[in-house]
From Swiss-Prot:
Subcellular location: Cytoplasm
Family: Belongs to the eukaryotic release factor 1 family. Pelota subfamily.
GO biological process, one term: nuclear-transcribed mRNA catabolic process, non-stop decay
Protein name per UniProt: Protein pelota homolog
Protein backbone atom coordinates (compact mmCIF):
# COMPACT_ATOMS: atom_id res chain seq x y z
CA UNK A 1 0.00 0.00 0.00
CA UNK A 2 1.25 3.46 -0.78
CA UNK A 3 -0.07 6.92 0.07
CA UNK A 4 -0.43 9.19 -2.95
CA UNK A 5 -1.75 12.27 -1.15
CA UNK A 6 -2.61 13.20 2.43
CA UNK A 7 -4.37 16.28 3.79
CA UNK A 8 -4.44 15.95 7.57
CA UNK A 9 -6.39 19.19 8.02
CA UNK A 10 -9.24 17.99 5.78
CA UNK A 11 -8.99 14.37 6.94
CA UNK A 12 -8.34 13.14 3.40
CA UNK A 13 -6.00 10.33 2.35
CA UNK A 14 -5.57 9.04 -1.20
CA UNK A 15 -3.86 5.67 -1.41
CA UNK A 16 -3.27 2.73 -3.72
CA UNK A 17 -3.83 -0.84 -2.46
CA UNK A 18 -1.26 -3.20 -3.99
CA UNK A 19 -1.93 -6.57 -2.35
CA UNK A 20 -4.76 -8.68 -0.94
CA UNK A 21 -3.45 -7.80 2.52
CA UNK A 22 -3.94 -4.10 1.70
CA UNK A 23 -7.61 -4.72 0.89
CA UNK A 24 -7.99 -6.52 4.21
CA UNK A 25 -6.46 -3.57 6.08
CA UNK A 26 -8.74 -1.16 4.21
CA UNK A 27 -11.81 -3.18 5.19
CA UNK A 28 -11.04 -2.17 8.78
CA UNK A 29 -9.73 1.34 8.16
CA UNK A 30 -12.84 2.43 6.23
CA UNK A 31 -15.81 2.97 8.58
CA UNK A 32 -19.51 3.56 8.16
CA UNK A 33 -19.98 7.30 7.58
CA UNK A 34 -16.68 7.81 5.76
CA UNK A 35 -16.69 9.47 2.37
CA UNK A 36 -14.94 7.38 -0.30
CA UNK A 37 -14.08 8.32 -3.89
CA UNK A 38 -12.83 5.90 -6.53
CA UNK A 39 -13.23 4.77 -10.10
CA UNK A 40 -16.14 2.41 -10.52
CA UNK A 41 -18.06 0.60 -13.23
CA UNK A 42 -21.82 0.67 -13.57
CA UNK A 43 -24.19 -0.67 -16.21
CA UNK A 44 -26.01 2.33 -17.66
CA UNK A 45 -29.21 2.03 -19.70
CA UNK A 46 -28.48 2.77 -23.36
CA UNK A 47 -31.30 4.59 -25.15
CA UNK A 48 -29.69 4.79 -28.58
CA UNK A 49 -32.37 2.59 -30.13
CA UNK A 50 -30.51 -0.70 -30.10
CA UNK A 51 -33.07 -2.81 -28.24
CA UNK A 52 -30.62 -5.51 -27.16
CA UNK A 53 -28.14 -2.99 -25.80
CA UNK A 54 -30.97 -0.98 -24.27
CA UNK A 55 -32.24 -4.02 -22.39
CA UNK A 56 -28.85 -4.91 -20.94
CA UNK A 57 -27.35 -1.45 -20.78
CA UNK A 58 -23.67 -0.64 -21.34
CA UNK A 59 -20.84 -0.65 -18.83
CA UNK A 60 -19.34 2.76 -18.13
CA UNK A 61 -16.34 3.57 -15.93
CA UNK A 62 -16.24 6.87 -14.04
CA UNK A 63 -15.26 8.37 -10.69
CA UNK A 64 -17.86 8.87 -7.98
CA UNK A 65 -18.07 9.50 -4.26
CA UNK A 66 -20.23 7.66 -1.75
CA UNK A 67 -20.99 7.98 1.94
CA UNK A 68 -20.25 4.47 3.18
CA UNK A 69 -23.07 2.47 4.79
CA UNK A 70 -21.72 -1.07 4.53
CA UNK A 71 -18.28 -2.71 4.20
CA UNK A 72 -17.74 -6.32 3.12
CA UNK A 73 -14.47 -8.16 2.56
CA UNK A 74 -14.69 -11.68 1.16
CA UNK A 75 -11.48 -13.41 2.17
CA UNK A 76 -11.84 -16.31 -0.27
CA UNK A 77 -12.48 -14.14 -3.32
CA UNK A 78 -10.30 -11.24 -2.17
CA UNK A 79 -13.02 -8.71 -2.97
CA UNK A 80 -13.59 -5.54 -0.92
CA UNK A 81 -16.95 -3.87 -1.55
CA UNK A 82 -18.12 -0.53 -0.13
CA UNK A 83 -21.82 0.26 -0.40
CA UNK A 84 -23.35 3.66 0.22
CA UNK A 85 -25.24 6.70 -1.03
CA UNK A 86 -23.82 8.53 -4.06
CA UNK A 87 -22.91 12.13 -3.16
CA UNK A 88 -20.87 13.10 -6.20
CA UNK A 89 -20.52 11.85 -9.77
CA UNK A 90 -21.61 12.45 -13.37
CA UNK A 91 -25.30 13.28 -12.94
CA UNK A 92 -26.05 12.39 -16.55
CA UNK A 93 -25.07 8.80 -15.72
CA UNK A 94 -26.10 8.28 -12.10
CA UNK A 95 -28.69 9.99 -9.87
CA UNK A 96 -27.26 11.53 -6.72
CA UNK A 97 -28.77 10.01 -3.59
CA UNK A 98 -29.05 6.54 -5.09
CA UNK A 99 -27.12 3.58 -3.73
CA UNK A 100 -24.04 2.11 -5.35
CA UNK A 101 -21.39 -0.48 -4.48
CA UNK A 102 -17.76 0.35 -5.16
CA UNK A 103 -15.47 -2.65 -5.58
CA UNK A 104 -12.03 -1.55 -4.41
CA UNK A 105 -9.47 -2.83 -6.91
CA UNK A 106 -5.75 -3.42 -6.63
CA UNK A 107 -3.51 -0.70 -8.08
CA UNK A 108 -6.46 1.70 -8.36
CA UNK A 109 -6.39 4.89 -6.24
CA UNK A 110 -9.04 5.34 -3.56
CA UNK A 111 -9.65 8.51 -1.55
CA UNK A 112 -10.94 8.25 2.02
CA UNK A 113 -12.28 11.23 3.97
CA UNK A 114 -13.06 10.99 7.68
CA UNK A 115 -14.39 13.61 10.05
CA UNK A 116 -11.53 12.57 12.31
CA UNK A 117 -8.80 10.00 11.78
CA UNK A 118 -8.53 8.06 15.05
CA UNK A 119 -5.06 7.15 16.30
CA UNK A 120 -5.72 3.44 15.80
CA UNK A 121 -6.76 4.00 12.17
CA UNK A 122 -3.62 6.02 11.39
CA UNK A 123 -1.52 3.40 13.15
CA UNK A 124 -3.13 0.63 11.11
CA UNK A 125 -2.58 2.56 7.90
CA UNK A 126 1.11 2.96 8.72
CA UNK A 127 1.36 -0.73 9.64
CA UNK A 128 -0.12 -1.68 6.27
CA UNK A 129 2.38 0.53 4.44
CA UNK A 130 5.33 -0.87 6.39
CA UNK A 131 4.10 -4.46 6.09
CA UNK A 132 3.85 -4.17 2.32
CA UNK A 133 7.63 -3.69 2.26
CA UNK A 134 8.22 -6.89 4.18
CA UNK A 135 8.32 -10.48 3.00
CA UNK A 136 6.08 -13.35 3.98
CA UNK A 137 6.83 -16.59 5.81
CA UNK A 138 5.60 -20.04 4.89
CA UNK A 139 5.07 -23.09 7.10
CA UNK A 140 5.65 -26.47 5.43
CA UNK A 141 3.91 -29.11 7.57
CA UNK A 142 5.06 -32.63 6.63
CA UNK A 143 3.63 -35.95 7.75
CA UNK A 144 4.51 -39.24 5.99
CA UNK A 145 3.64 -38.59 2.33
CA UNK A 146 1.44 -35.54 2.87
CA UNK A 147 2.35 -31.86 3.09
CA UNK A 148 0.23 -28.83 3.97
CA UNK A 149 1.43 -25.28 3.38
CA UNK A 150 0.45 -22.30 5.51
CA UNK A 151 1.25 -18.97 3.87
CA UNK A 152 1.44 -16.20 6.46
CA UNK A 153 -0.60 -13.23 5.35
CA UNK A 154 -1.59 -10.25 7.45
CA UNK A 155 -5.29 -11.13 7.31
CA UNK A 156 -4.63 -14.69 8.44
CA UNK A 157 -3.29 -18.00 7.22
CA UNK A 158 -3.79 -19.00 3.61
CA UNK A 159 -3.69 -22.79 3.27
CA UNK A 160 -2.45 -24.79 0.32
CA UNK A 161 -2.70 -28.53 0.02
CA UNK A 162 -2.71 -31.20 0.97
CA UNK A 163 0.14 -32.14 -1.36
CA UNK A 164 0.17 -35.91 -1.70
CA UNK A 165 3.03 -38.25 -2.54
CA UNK A 166 3.08 -41.95 -3.34
CA UNK A 167 5.65 -43.10 -0.80
CA UNK A 168 5.30 -46.71 0.35
CA UNK A 169 4.70 -47.22 4.06
CA UNK A 170 7.32 -49.97 4.19
CA UNK A 171 10.37 -48.82 6.07
CA UNK A 172 12.84 -50.48 3.74
CA UNK A 173 15.50 -48.76 1.74
CA UNK A 174 15.12 -49.47 -1.93
CA UNK A 175 15.52 -47.50 -5.12
CA UNK A 176 11.79 -47.23 -5.81
CA UNK A 177 11.00 -45.84 -2.37
CA UNK A 178 13.90 -43.38 -2.51
CA UNK A 179 12.72 -42.23 -5.93
CA UNK A 180 9.14 -41.79 -4.66
CA UNK A 181 10.38 -39.75 -1.67
CA UNK A 182 12.46 -37.50 -3.94
CA UNK A 183 9.48 -37.00 -6.27
CA UNK A 184 7.28 -36.09 -3.30
CA UNK A 185 9.84 -33.60 -1.98
CA UNK A 186 10.20 -32.00 -5.40
CA UNK A 187 6.42 -31.71 -5.60
CA UNK A 188 6.42 -29.85 -2.26
CA UNK A 189 9.31 -27.63 -3.38
CA UNK A 190 7.50 -26.82 -6.62
CA UNK A 191 4.49 -25.67 -4.57
CA UNK A 192 6.68 -23.55 -2.27
CA UNK A 193 8.37 -21.90 -5.26
CA UNK A 194 5.00 -20.72 -6.59
CA UNK A 195 5.18 -18.01 -3.93
CA UNK A 196 7.73 -15.32 -4.64
CA UNK A 197 9.82 -13.39 -2.11
CA UNK A 198 9.37 -15.84 0.77
CA UNK A 199 11.90 -14.79 3.38
CA UNK A 200 11.38 -17.48 6.02
CA UNK A 201 10.40 -21.14 5.84
CA UNK A 202 9.41 -23.24 8.85
CA UNK A 203 9.73 -26.95 8.11
CA UNK A 204 7.55 -28.68 10.70
CA UNK A 205 5.82 -31.93 11.53
CA UNK A 206 5.29 -34.64 14.15
CA UNK A 207 7.82 -37.23 12.92
CA UNK A 208 11.18 -37.47 11.18
CA UNK A 209 9.97 -36.56 7.69
CA UNK A 210 10.61 -32.88 8.39
CA UNK A 211 14.27 -33.61 9.19
CA UNK A 212 14.66 -35.74 6.08
CA UNK A 213 13.06 -33.02 3.95
CA UNK A 214 15.38 -30.39 5.45
CA UNK A 215 18.43 -32.56 4.67
CA UNK A 216 17.13 -32.99 1.13
CA UNK A 217 16.80 -29.25 0.47
CA UNK A 218 20.22 -28.65 2.04
CA UNK A 219 21.71 -30.90 -0.63
CA UNK A 220 19.45 -30.06 -3.57
CA UNK A 221 17.99 -26.59 -2.92
CA UNK A 222 20.41 -24.64 -0.75
CA UNK A 223 18.62 -21.35 -1.46
CA UNK A 224 15.54 -22.69 0.35
CA UNK A 225 17.53 -24.36 3.13
CA UNK A 226 19.21 -21.03 3.93
CA UNK A 227 15.76 -19.59 4.75
CA UNK A 228 14.51 -22.63 6.68
CA UNK A 229 14.38 -23.80 10.28
CA UNK A 230 12.93 -27.02 11.75
CA UNK A 231 10.09 -27.11 14.30
CA UNK A 232 8.45 -30.14 15.94
CA UNK A 233 4.68 -30.49 16.29
CA UNK A 234 2.40 -33.10 17.81
CA UNK A 235 -0.02 -33.08 14.88
CA UNK A 236 -0.03 -32.81 11.11
CA UNK A 237 -2.07 -30.65 8.74
CA UNK A 238 -3.69 -27.40 9.78
CA UNK A 239 -3.66 -28.36 13.47
CA UNK A 240 0.12 -28.64 13.29
CA UNK A 241 0.37 -25.24 11.60
CA UNK A 242 -1.58 -23.71 14.50
CA UNK A 243 0.86 -25.37 16.92
CA UNK A 244 3.74 -23.61 15.18
CA UNK A 245 1.94 -20.27 15.47
CA UNK A 246 1.17 -20.73 19.16
CA UNK A 247 4.83 -21.44 19.88
CA UNK A 248 5.76 -18.05 18.47
CA UNK A 249 8.25 -19.62 16.05
CA UNK A 250 7.17 -17.47 13.12
CA UNK A 251 7.11 -14.35 15.28
CA UNK A 252 10.77 -14.90 16.14
CA UNK A 253 11.58 -15.08 12.45
CA UNK A 254 9.31 -12.26 11.28
CA UNK A 255 8.74 -10.01 14.25
CA UNK A 256 6.36 -7.81 12.30
CA UNK A 257 4.21 -10.70 11.10
CA UNK A 258 0.75 -9.76 12.25
CA UNK A 259 -0.88 -13.18 12.47
CA UNK A 260 1.90 -14.70 14.54
CA UNK A 261 1.89 -11.71 16.90
CA UNK A 262 -1.88 -11.91 17.32
CA UNK A 263 -1.78 -15.64 18.06
CA UNK A 264 0.92 -15.14 20.71
CA UNK A 265 -1.09 -12.28 22.30
CA UNK A 266 -4.24 -14.43 22.49
CA UNK A 267 -2.25 -17.36 23.88
CA UNK A 268 -0.82 -15.10 26.61
CA UNK A 269 -4.32 -13.86 27.43
CA UNK A 270 -5.69 -17.40 27.71
CA UNK A 271 -2.79 -18.39 29.96
CA UNK A 272 -3.61 -15.50 32.31
CA UNK A 273 -7.28 -16.50 32.35
CA UNK A 274 -6.26 -20.11 33.00
CA UNK A 275 -4.26 -19.00 36.04
CA UNK A 276 -7.32 -17.13 37.38
CA UNK A 277 -5.25 -13.96 37.24
CA UNK A 278 -6.83 -10.76 38.50
CA UNK A 279 -4.84 -8.75 35.98
CA UNK A 280 -7.11 -9.60 33.08
CA UNK A 281 -10.51 -8.38 31.88
CA UNK A 282 -12.71 -9.71 29.10
CA UNK A 283 -16.14 -8.97 27.70
CA UNK A 284 -17.42 -5.46 26.96
CA UNK A 285 -18.50 -4.48 30.47
CA UNK A 286 -15.32 -5.49 32.30
CA UNK A 287 -12.96 -4.29 29.57
CA UNK A 288 -14.57 -0.85 29.23
CA UNK A 289 -14.46 -0.49 33.02
CA UNK A 290 -10.72 -1.23 32.99
CA UNK A 291 -10.15 1.27 30.16
CA UNK A 292 -11.99 4.03 32.03
CA UNK A 293 -9.86 3.33 35.11
CA UNK A 294 -6.65 3.62 33.09
CA UNK A 295 -5.67 0.08 34.07
CA UNK A 296 -5.15 -1.40 30.60
CA UNK A 297 -1.65 -2.44 29.63
CA UNK A 298 -2.70 -4.22 26.42
CA UNK A 299 -6.13 -4.07 24.76
CA UNK A 300 -7.17 -6.83 22.36
CA UNK A 301 -10.16 -6.03 20.11
CA UNK A 302 -11.70 -8.26 17.45
CA UNK A 303 -11.66 -6.55 14.05
CA UNK A 304 -15.44 -6.86 13.64
CA UNK A 305 -15.96 -5.02 16.95
CA UNK A 306 -13.90 -1.94 16.04
CA UNK A 307 -16.83 -0.12 14.41
CA UNK A 308 -19.20 -0.82 17.31
CA UNK A 309 -20.39 2.00 19.57
CA UNK A 310 -17.53 4.10 20.95
CA UNK A 311 -14.73 1.59 20.35
CA UNK A 312 -12.52 4.00 18.41
CA UNK A 313 -12.49 6.51 21.26
CA UNK A 314 -11.85 3.76 23.80
CA UNK A 315 -8.87 2.54 21.77
CA UNK A 316 -7.52 6.09 21.63
CA UNK A 317 -7.94 6.36 25.43
CA UNK A 318 -5.78 3.27 25.95
CA UNK A 319 -3.02 4.60 23.68
CA UNK A 320 -3.16 8.06 25.28
CA UNK A 321 -2.46 6.36 28.63
CA UNK A 322 0.55 4.52 27.14
CA UNK A 323 -1.29 1.26 26.67
CA UNK A 324 -0.95 -1.00 23.62
CA UNK A 325 -3.87 -1.67 21.28
CA UNK A 326 -3.96 -4.75 19.06
CA UNK A 327 -6.79 -5.38 16.60
CA UNK A 328 -7.19 -9.15 16.22
CA UNK A 329 -8.24 -10.69 12.90
CA UNK A 330 -11.40 -12.79 13.00
CA UNK A 331 -9.94 -14.95 10.21
CA UNK A 332 -7.82 -17.22 12.41
CA UNK A 333 -8.19 -19.39 15.51
CA UNK A 334 -7.06 -16.64 17.87
CA UNK A 335 -9.83 -14.36 16.60
CA UNK A 336 -12.42 -17.08 17.17
CA UNK A 337 -11.18 -17.50 20.74
CA UNK A 338 -11.40 -13.76 21.40
CA UNK A 339 -14.92 -13.71 19.95
CA UNK A 340 -15.87 -16.35 22.51
CA UNK A 341 -14.65 -14.00 25.25
CA UNK A 342 -16.90 -11.16 24.10
CA UNK A 343 -14.77 -9.78 21.23
CA UNK A 344 -12.57 -7.70 23.52
CA UNK A 345 -10.19 -8.33 26.40
CA UNK A 346 -7.31 -6.67 28.21
CA UNK A 347 -4.15 -7.44 30.13
CA UNK A 348 -4.09 -5.06 33.11
CA UNK A 349 -1.32 -3.12 34.82
CA UNK A 350 -2.85 -3.79 38.22
CA UNK A 351 -5.82 -5.51 39.81
CA UNK A 352 -9.15 -3.69 39.86
CA UNK A 353 -12.09 -4.31 42.15
Amino acid sequence: MKIVKQDKKEGIVTLVPETLDDLWHLSHIVEVGDSVSSKTTRRIQDNTGDKLRSDRGVKKTFTLRIDVENITFHIFTGKLRLTGVITKGPEDLIPLGSHHTVEVKLNTPITIKKEKWANWALKRLNQAIEASKKLAAIIVLLEDDTATLGLMRQFGIEYYGPIKGSVSGKRIVDKNRSKAIAQFYEKVIESVNKFHDIQNIVVAGPGFVKNDFYDYIKNKHKDLADKAIIESTGSGGRVGIHEVLKKGTVEKLTVENRVASEMVAINNLLEEIGKNSSKVAYGEKETVKAINLGAVKQLLVLDSAVAINDMGNLMDMVENMNGEVMVISSQHEGGEQLKGLGSMAAILRYEIA
